[in-house]
Design a protein with these regions (language model features):
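Acidic, metal-coordinating catalytic cores used for nucleic-acid/nucleotide bond scission
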Residues: 51-54, 103-108
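SAM cofactor-binding core of SAM-dependent methyltransferases
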Residues: 1-84
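Short amphipathic alpha-helix with an adjacent loop that forms part of the alpha/beta core around
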Residues: 81-92, 114
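A conserved mid-domain beta-alpha-beta active-site/ligand-binding segment of alpha/beta enzyme cores
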Residues: 140-202
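A short, conserved alpha-helix within the catalytic core of class I
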Residues: 106-118
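Generic beta-sheet signal
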Residues: 7, 95-101
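Short, conserved loop/helix-junction motifs that constitute active-site signature segments
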Residues: 38-40, 116-120
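Conserved beta-strand signature within the Rossmann-like core of class I S-adenosyl-L-methionine
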Residues: 120-135
């Protein structure tokens, strides 16, 4: 559209740009390369990656696309988004962006999503790390969750009330315990989606 001064692409967990498949024998195009190969390119690309060897791969890929404006941010996704990228994209800038957030685990923070939402200029696609959530916080008993996993989930969820979606109190032979709700995995994903819709109403 005529009023738009730029349409930018943000990849919060960029990886190498061409990761191996699970069989470790073939390579597939990762999200950065897919975005760069689009027929109608974005005006700017923001790739965030925290692992050094993956950053080197992204730098190599950058040389393959000399006509693309590519910025690589070495570091934590939340920090890079909140401090370096999101502030450059207020709605008043007349620039718009799409952010693809596909974390390997529970690194994403709700505060980051909230800051993105407040711009009203960035469309977000999130791949919720369901496997990481199931592995780390959907234990048989709430007391089995490690402090580190609990902290990660608190940051991802934005509050501590996610436990009410996963655990309920039941009487056992050893007294009352907070135990996992049978369908809590699906319920947790549904509730997270609903919370996203509250801050991204459109």
């Amino acid at each position: 559209q005529d009023w738009c001064k730029g349409y930018e692409y943000i990849d919060g967990f960029a990886g190498t740009g061409k990761p191996k498949t699970r069989d470790e024998e073939t390579y597939v195009d990762g999200s950065p390369r897919v975005a760069l190969d689009l027929q109608y390119p974005f005006t700017k690309y923001h790739f965030i990656e925290s692992t050094e060897w993956r950053i080197r791969k992204l730098e190599e890929m950058k040389t393959e696309f000399p006509d693309r404006q590519i910025e690589i941010y070495p570091g934590d996704c939340n920090k890079m988004l909140r401090e370096q990228i999101v502030p450059t994209l207020p709605r008043s800038s007349y620039k718009r962006a799409v952010a693809f957030l596909d974390p390997f685990g529970m690194q994403l923070e709700w505060n980051t999503l909230n800051e993105i939402a407040q711009t009203r200029a960035i469309e977000v696609f999130i791949n919720l790390p369901v496997m990481a959530i199931n592995r780390n916080v959907r234990r048989r008993r709430e007391e089995d969750i490690t402090p580190a996993a609990r902290e990660c989930m608190d940051r991802l969820w934005g509050t501590t009330d996610w436990t009410a979606e996963v655990y309920e109190e039941k009487q056992t032979l050893f007294g009352p315990e907070r135990v996992r709700i049978k369908q809590s995995g699906k319920d947790l994903g549904r509730r997270f989606r609903n919370r996203l819709m509250e801050i991204f109403p459109n």
